[in-house]
Amino acid sequence: MLKLAIPKGRLEEKVMTYLKKTGVIFERESSILREGKDIVCFMVRPFDVPTYLVHGVADIGFCGTDVLLEKETSLIQPFFIPTNISRMVLAGPKGRGIPEGEKRIATKFPNVTQRYCESKGWHCRIIPLKGSVELAPIAGLSDLIVDITETGRTLKENNLEILDEIFVIRTHVVVNPVSYRTKREEVVSFLEKLQEVIEHDSNEQSRG
């Protein structure tokens, strides 16, 4: 029995489509659990995917580069799933640039932001937020923000501009290292089927 951690939200539909194309048939489905022959899918928040794998509850999961780097886990990452590419960026009020001295940075990703500031040699005060990070500079809570953007539209709507690109975000297939050892045959077979489906879809799209 393979146990998968599936991120709820924008990735859910794409991941589930790929799973069904590998031949998975779900006999029971709910908002939090989907069960089929020899497979169980836990529907979880994207940030919780690595936690389910690290604690041995799930064997395989799907999550973004942002989550992996924020959580700092040592999961196996065999390949990506094709999705729209987004970026983790440093942004601030248009025309102000990066302030001198201590920088107040609001973000949903404090660990990523801390490492970024250290790499720049900056003295920063990091302000963790759960949502509406773009509001922080407008309200005077922060000088800058570190956040995810795909098109940059939300930043522009809030009179913010990108000051630096920290990294590109992709969707990773991740595997629990213990499961890879103890369920190697099942895990490898599943990954091979999934990769075949992804490659087939990519080839179909490239042919137009």
Curated annotation (Swiss-Prot):
Which CDD domains is this protein grouped with? PBP2_HisGs (cd13595)
MF terms per GO, please? ATP binding; ATP phosphoribosyltransferase activity
List its EC numbers: 2.4.2.17
Q: Where does the record say this protein resides?
A: Cytoplasm
Q: Which reaction does it catalyse?
A: 1-(5-phospho-beta-D-ribosyl)-ATP + diphosphate = 5-phospho-alpha-D-ribose 1-diphosphate + ATP
Q: Which HAMAP family match?
A: HisG_Short (MF_01018)
Family that this chain belongs to: Belongs to the ATP phosphoribosyltransferase family. Short subfamily.
Name of the molecule in the record: ATP phosphoribosyltransferase
